[in-house]
A protein has these predicted regions:
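Extended beta-strand solenoid/passenger and fiber regions
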Residues: 137-234, 245-257
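Beta-rich globular "head" domains
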Residues: 188-205, 270, 504-519
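Extracellular Ig-like/FN3 beta-sandwich strand-entry sites
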Residues: 235-239, 555-557
């Protein structure tokens, strides 16, 4: 056991990240670290974060940034205020842009690529872009009945005498097709719906053995009864296909007003519609232009909004806002079905702690933000029970006090989960984890402060893009923040050397620090003695091992802070 006169040597190393918990901070963590991280692609050292380089200014709020490659040509689209722009000379500055659309929603948009087509949604629009043309998504026209006799009854040649429905109604289009076999006697054909849309909305069409027929020229329509009368009676066994329009109640807006989407099981799932707070919709297999009117699932009965839909562990997790006396977690499991091939019944989870902002599948860890911080979902066998595992105790005291906490935005970047809140970024490190006192696995964290308020964040091919309210778009690179110095520091935890009540004196032999050589001539070292800054020393990192001295007497605890701009 050491006596009071013993020389105690400290070796501070294997630094892991920050600890803002105000508890006993480990020697490997810092209670006060700013704008530093570990770039695993470069070295294992803690170093200053990259800078922010201005790419362009678009004179309105950045709400979306989309990269799309078609035939080896990269297309860059930017959602700026109410406009969707094509950045034709990316990444050159100033930007040369082409307006593709001028009625975008003033909220953050999202995208996905399906069958080499870029699809974009913003809460009021559902658009597609093929590299040349941007247009509203045109829904696949379903064949809602077939093998019909002219009177609408089932054909005697069919395999069954029940009324067959070939394809359900598509929410993304008002159009439907009916197929018949002509009997050589009937001019009137009964459709499978009545009270059709007016002729001003859609002039009906038909084909007889693939020969096009047009309303008011080749046939007339009784829209109230859904009856088509041909001028010339179709021949026996001729194939008659009639296309008509019947708008379903709020069908289109079910999907257009969704604010969340994700790909799962070769389908696109949609949710977040404020008018359908419990609903999750999905498209048909490999067809994002077709959302049948029965393809939705109710997650709960309350008005708590769905905040996140996250694929993970072969299910789709549905996370809702906090609601008293009700589960906030549901999951949809792919299930074989004789009618629709696949359905996704909703199962009530066992977690009631609500999601207050968003969530993500972070390297196979399904996480979301509650009013207590970042939570991870762990499963018992067969999903019979879900268990919450806390992931952010090291930064909760600071992160939860952020005024914009409920509007946190997420991006994965170089193995980190970046949690953006205004101008602050909290970085969860997927490669450094620890087990807390409750045996939960948590992340190590870093913390950045940016010189500009940032409202948009996106990662693409290991590049990080940041946008703001005034239309500035930055990329994370370089050694300055758009020519401004980056102030960074790392403070070792308070150390009383095992004797809290006794005073100490530093040894005259001094200290050494192991630097990564970055040719920085302005590394400042401060000593913080019993809470007061005492000394300042300026060092250079031209050598890897650099000696320095600390001269302090009669202190109870001491810290060392390294800083640089």
């Amino acid at each position: 056991m050491s006596s009071l006169n013993d020389l105690i040597t400290r070796n501070y190393n294997n630094f892991r990240g920050v600890d803002f918990s105000n508890n006993n901070v480990s020697f490997s963590r810092s209670p006060d670290m700013l704008n530093m991280w570990r770039d695993y692609q470069d070295s294992d050292c803690i170093q200053t974060r990259p800078g922010m380089k201005l790419l362009n200014t678009f004179n309105n709020k950045i709400l979306g940034l989309f990269f799309y490659i078609k035939e080896d040509i990269q297309h860059v689209l930017v959602h700026v205020g109410p406009k969707l722009l094509k950045w034709t000379n990316y990444p050159n500055m100033p930007a040369t842009t082409q307006e593709l659309y001028t009625s975008m929603n003033i909220q953050e948009s999202r995208s996905f690529v399906f069958d080499n087509i870029l699809f974009i949604m913003d809460g009021i629009n559902y658009l597609e872009y093929d590299g040349e043309t941007l247009k509203k998504v045109e829904g696949t026209v379903p064949m809602t009945s077939y093998y019909k006799n002219p009177d609408g009854s089932t054909s005697i040649d069919s395999d069954t005498d029940i009324d067959l429905v070939y394809q359900p109604v598509n929410c993304l289009t008002s159009l439907r097709k009916n197929a018949f076999f002509g009997d050589g006697k009937s001019a009137k054909y009964q459709l499978d719906a009545q009270e059709l849309d007016s002729v001003s909305k859609y002039l009906m069409e038909a084909t007889i053995n693939n020969v096009k027929k047009v309303e008011n020229i080749d046939f007339i329509v009784d829209r109230d009864k859904g009856i088509v009368t041909f001028n010339d009676i179709p021949e026996k066994d001729s194939e008659v296909v009639i296309t008509y329009s019947k708008t379903g109640k709020d069908h289109l807006n079910r999907i257009l007003n969704c604010t969340l989407s994700c790909e799962f099981d070769n389908r696109i799932f949609f949710s977040g519609n404020p008018n359908y707070p419990n609903s999750v919709f999905h498209c048909e297999l490999n067809d994002p232009r077709y959302v049948r009117d029965t393809a939705y699932y109710e997650c709960g009965l309350n008005l708590a909004q769905v905040k996140a839909i996250i694929p993970g562990n072969n299910v789709l997790w549905v996370l809702k806002d906090l609601e008293q006396n009700s589960s906030s977690l549901y999951y949809l499991t792919p299930t074989l079905d004789s009618t629709y091939n696949k359905i996704y019944p909703s199962v009530n989870g066992s977690i009631s702690l609500g999601c207050v902002s968003c969530g993500i599948n972070f390297n196979d860890d399904v996480v979301f933000f509650s009013n207590k911080g970042l939570e991870g979902i762990s499963n018992s066998s067969l999903y019979s029970e879900q268990i919450l595992k806390h992931r952010s105790s090291l930064v909760d005291s600071k992160m939860l006090s952020e005024t914009g906490y409920k509007d946190v935005k997420l991006a994965e970047y170089k193995g980190y989960l970046l949690c953006l809140i205004d101008s602050h970024i909290y970085l969860a490190d997927s490669r450094k984890k620890f087990q807390n006192n409750s045996n939960d696995i948590e992340y190590e964290w870093f913390y950045w402060e940016l010189p500009f308020s940032i409202t948009f964040i996106k990662e693409y091919r290991e590049n990080l893009y940041l946008g703001n309210e005034i239309g500035q778009l930055f990329i994370l690179e370089g050694k300055t923040d758009n020519s401004k110095d980056i102030n960074s520091h790392f403070t070792i935890c308070k150390d009383n050397f095992g004797y809290q009540g006794y005073t100490k004196t530093t040894n005259k032999r001094g200290n050494v620090v192991d630097f990564k050589i970055m040719n920085n001539d302005n590394i400042k070292i401060d000593t913080i003695v019993d809470g007061t800054i005492k000394e300042k020393t300026v060092l250079s990192d031209k050598n890897e091992i650099v000696p320095f001295r600390i001269k302090d007497k009669k202190f109870k605890e001491i810290q060392v802070r390294f800083s640089s701009n």
